[in-house]
UniProtKB/Swiss-Prot annotation:
It comes from Mannheimia succiniciproducens (strain KCTC 0769BP / MBEL55E). CDD domains: SIS_PGI_1, SIS_PGI_2. This is Glucose-6-phosphate isomerase. One of its GO terms (molecular function) is carbohydrate derivative binding. PROSITE patterns: P_GLUCOSE_ISOMERASE_1 (PS00765), P_GLUCOSE_ISOMERASE_2 (PS00174), P_GLUCOSE_ISOMERASE_3 (PS51463). Pfam families: PGI. One of its GO terms (biological process) is gluconeogenesis. Belongs to the GPI family. The active site is at E355 (proton donor), H387, K515. Keywords: Cytoplasm, Gluconeogenesis, Glycolysis, Isomerase. It is found in: Cytoplasm. Pathway: Carbohydrate biosynthesis; gluconeogenesis; Carbohydrate degradation; glycolysis; D-glyceraldehyde 3-phosphate and glycerone phosphate from D-glucose: step 2/4. The keyword Repeat does not apply. Catalyzes the reversible isomerization of glucose-6-phosphate to fructose-6-phosphate.
């Protein structure tokens, strides 16, 4: 991948000038000028996902310049480098090949001259065989009872992805009860212990190195809890499996290495749900549905790799997002799924985007000072968010572009719930784009029998400026296939932006310093003596903690 500061390109400079030409133009103006705006500014994937980006403050010229920017930043070259197994994660000297995990075509993917697909398929086959034994009840616990509960112990990518997907695909789940433990706060796992029976519980310990502090602390507590009932350490093998590559530590823990499911250093944590880390997904919805999830992602991979940029959905979303953050002044993006099963989707891509593109050093090793990299990502399901933070989106002083996501078909057709939900989905993007003028507010008061003199002090508060950018992403239905495609779409959006931002999207050095300092502080917490080795604030906090505990 090349080192190209995007602000040095002709396209960026042209975009700066172009921004000025739209300064007094609103989204409403653009709809008045372009009668076919919806058709011209929307794309469809596989007749399953419709992406409408028409309610952004963009024109054809904007899109053409953004596409030029992508070209001048060598996006196509970077894309091929990723798919072909080049080590584009240069700070860790690793390939980036989560796409190989869902490569349903089985065409060879080479890393250091070796095809990785045989190993990928071998792990998939092993996961299938294991999951079928557990789901069918053939796998027995130490007292001969079938497994009823599965507890996934992991953190970050080893938790967020599997948890999000198992929740999103809850309509497809089987009889097994799924639990996810991530926080090192003992409360998290203690609450799971209250709901489970050691005789019928299977723990999945998800840690590539089998040394992750939070995960191994929870895993050891789970082992202690289990052995308090089971007594004999040989029973651990019937109730624990490992998603790891450290066979020595796995064996030392008491897990049979036959029940160890490996993955590779070219799989980043936040892109790992497609790997052995997805075992909890398989145990929840079955292997066929997991395969459909992989297939949906693979189809989006093909679309992203092979489709010209003009019709390329992930690239288009990336470019529009970049326009909003770097040329319209936004610092944040909200992801708002109008589907309760998708309640962890925003949290998942909060990690996906912010850990990938939350960087301030460019690929050239220089500090980035004249453009924005990754935005702040957040969100909640609709309609809950409407009664919480939409006030600020509509009438606040901060510009917040939003992605609205909804399925046309619901898995739970109760009375008119879904029509009411979707009426809000459609209404919100309309309200954000077009707002409500002072004249409309006054007309509404007059119609209600009020005089303008009576209401003149209230009118300004009921005006909506509009001109707030949104994307609408409408799925036919949330299925394993369409969810896989949707996740891959957002993954590739993040990749495109990282290429243009000239950063390394697949490392995460920003998480290291806090961990290092925590390791230094931990032994200081065990005694009663005063701590003096930090700044006055940290010393004061630690010493107050010691006094109060």
């Amino acid at each position: 991948m090349q080192n190209i500061n995007p602000t040095s390109t002709a396209a960026w400079k042209a975009l700066e000038a172009h921004k000025g030409t739209l300064e007094n133009t609103t989204i409403n103006d653009l709809f008045q000028q372009e009668k076919n705006r919806f058709a011209d500014y929307s794309l469809t994937f596989n007749n399953e996902i419709l992406v409408d980006f028409s309610k952004n403050k963009i024109t054809r010229e904007t899109l053409n310049l953004l596409r030029r920017l992508a070209k001048e930043c060598a996006l196509d070259e970077a894309k091929e480098a990723m798919f072909s197994g080049e080590k584009i994660n240069r700070t860790e000297n690793r390939a980036v090949l989560h796409t190989a995990l869902r490569n349903r075509s089985n065409t060879a993917v080479l890393v250091d001259g070796k095809d990785v697909m045989p190993e990928v398929n071998e792990v998939l086959a092993k996961m299938k065989a294991f999951s079928e034994r557990v789901i069918s009840g053939e796998w027995k616990g130490y007292t001969g009872k079938a497994i009823t509960d599965v507890v996934n112990i992991g953190i970050g990518g080893s938790d967020l992805g599997p948890y999000m997907v198992t929740e999103a695909l809850r309509p497809y789940k089987n009889h097994l009860n799924m639990h996810f433990v991530s926080n090192v706060d003992g409360t998290h796992i203690a609450e799971v212990f209250k709901k489970t029976n050691p005789e019928t519980t299977l723990f999945l310990v998800a840690s590539k190195t089998f040394t992750t502090q939070e995960t191994m602390t929870n895993a050891k507590s789970a082992r202690d809890w289990f052995l308090a009932t089971a007594k004999d350490e040989k029973h651990v093998a019937k109730h624990f499996a490992a998603l790891s590559t450290n066979a020595a530590e796995v064996e030392k823990f008491g897990i049979d290495t036959d029940n160890m499911f490996g993955f590779w250093d070219w799989v980043g944590g936040r892109y790992s749900l497609w790997s052995a880390i997805g075992l909890s997904i398989i145990l929840s919805v079955g292997f066929e549905n997991f395969e459909a999830l992989l297939s949906g992602a693979h189809e989006m991979d093909k679309h992203f790799r092979n489709t010209p940029i003009e019709q390329n959905i992930p690239a288009t979303l990336a470019l529009v997002g970049l326009w909003n953050t770097n040329f319209q002044g936004a610092q944040t993006e909200a992801i708002l799924p109008y589907d309760q099963y998708m309640h962890r989707f925003a949290a998942y891509f909060q990690q996906g985007n912010m850990e990938s593109n939350g960087k301030y050093v460019g690929r050239d090793g220089k500090v980035i000072s004249n453009y924005q990299t990754g935005p702040i990502i957040w969100g909640e399901p609709g309609t809950n968010g409407q009664h919480a933070f939409y006030q600020l989106i509509h009438q606040g002083t901060t510009l917040i572009p939003c992605d609205f996501i909804a399925p046309a078909k619901t898995h739970n057709p109760l009375a008119d719930h879904h029509n009411k939900l979707l009426s809000n989905f459609f209404a919100q993007t309309e309200a954000l784009a077009f707002g409500k003028t002072k004249e409309t507010v006054e007309a509404e008061f007059l119609k209600a029998g009020k005089s303008l003199d009576e209401v003149k002090d209230v009118v300004p508060f009921k005006v909506f400026a509009g001109n707030k950018p949104t994307n609408s992403i409408l799925l036919q239905e949330i299925t394993p296939f369409s969810l896989g495609a949707l996740i891959a779409m957002y993954e590739h959006k993040i990749f495109v932006q990282g290429v243009i931002f000239n950063i390394f999207s697949f490392d995460q050095w920003g998480v290291e310093l806090g961990k290092q300092l925590a390791n230094r502080i931990l032994p200081e917490l065990s005694g009663d003596e005063q701590v003096t080795g930090h700044d006055s604030s940290t010393n004061g906090l630690i010493n107050q903690f010691k006094a109060w505990r």
